[in-house]
Amino acid sequence: MYLLNNLALDLDAIFTQINLIYVLTACALAMSMGVFLAKKQARTFNEQGYAGADTATKGSENLPNVNFFEYGDMRFLHLGTPAVQGSMQISKPFDIHLEYVQRMMGWLLFADLNQVSHLQAMQMGLGAASLTKFCHMHLGMQTTAVELNPQVVAMCRLRFNLPQDNAKLQVIVGDAAEIAGQEKWRGKIDALQVDLSDQDAICPVLDSEAFYADCRQLLTANGCMTVNLFGRKANIDRSVQKIANAFGKDTLWSFKRTKAGNTILLAFRAPRTWDKNALLSQAQAIQVRWPLPAAKWLKVLAPVH
């Protein structure tokens, strides 16, 4: 009996190891297939001319490979490193589940909710397309996304439920810095969402006062830029100062830093004031309309002093 018990335990251990090897192998194959398909689609963009491309993708051959990983109901986007560049809940592909990405929608607290579908949104940095899909699918906004890496666009279309371009959705394969400086976009954007990082996700890749000044010029009179700041606190403080120099410090509101290390900053084209009761009513109205935890935002959002 002792030998049989030991044999059973050994067999369980062997089968556990086999299952683990099987899962890891399946994940590796899925990631490899994702890279292959994304590269193939990216080549199609470059060879045939991508309809949404307003600027050339310079040095695209040096951009990182794009892959994905699945765990349960979650799918994660990677740029060839362990750093997560975005994610999607497979059962709710058009919702936003990451806390810091939800906070990128904080501009809704200051918007006329009855007019949101008539506004224009722009995302600089596509990631897993969470913001782009939410603005397009849930809010019905005119939505433009700017992404440097054509493999990211291909992967989002293949694995992250990003719709094809249509009358209210455009994905531009190009440089966000160039787009920000283009005259055609000035004064047109109501909600500008900036989340730009490289494959290591250590700090924003575009973080100059000049870039933020160009971003300000894109906004309508009541427009708002939300930007994801991450990295060391000293670096975040420097970024806030650059944005303050470009926008004016009295236009800035900030969320407290998330546990994951993300600080979401709101920068308005012009200063905004709102009393606590009005913000609470607005947050409750947002929650009724859309799957966003807006009431929780009020506990961690305040003007920058």
Map each language-model feature to its residues.
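A short, flexible beta-alpha/helix-coil linker loop
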Residues: 83-86, 197-200, 225
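The AdoMet/dcAdoMet-binding core of the Class I SAM-like
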Residues: 59, 77, 94-221, 234
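SAM/dcSAM-binding transferase cores
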Residues: 38, 43-70, 84-91, 99, ...
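N-terminal signal-anchor transmembrane alpha helix of single-pass membrane proteins
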Residues: 24-38
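Short, strongly hydrophobic alpha-helical membrane anchors
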Residues: 1-17
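C-terminal substrate-binding/active-site "lid" region of AdoMet-derived donor-dependent transferases
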Residues: 209-274
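Short, basic/glycine-rich phosphate-binding loops at helix/coil junctions
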Residues: 80-87, 192
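Structural signature of hydrophobic alpha-helical transmembrane segments
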Residues: 19-22
